[in-house]
């Protein structure tokens, strides 16, 4: 199983926010991410779950 990993820039485009907003959310531990070397990476499935939680969307059955 491969994980679909996104860069900070890709997450910013996906969420339609400035990349600095992504860095701020990560530094405040409000957005799930991990580092590969010096670069932040985001797992798409984790990001989608986080987004649904932020929007209070109930999970699909």
Task: Identify the residue ranges that each predicted region occupies.
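A short, Lys/Arg-enriched interface patch at domain edges and termini
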Residues: 47-61
């Amino acid at each position: 199983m491969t994980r679909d990993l996104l860069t900070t820039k890709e997450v910013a485009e996906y969420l339609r926010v400035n990349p600095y907003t992504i860095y701020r959310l990560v530094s405040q531990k409000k957005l799930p991410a991990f580092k590969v070397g010096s670069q932040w990476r985001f797992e798409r499935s984790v990001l989608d779950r986080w987004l649904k939680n932020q929007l209070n969307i109930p999970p699909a059955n």
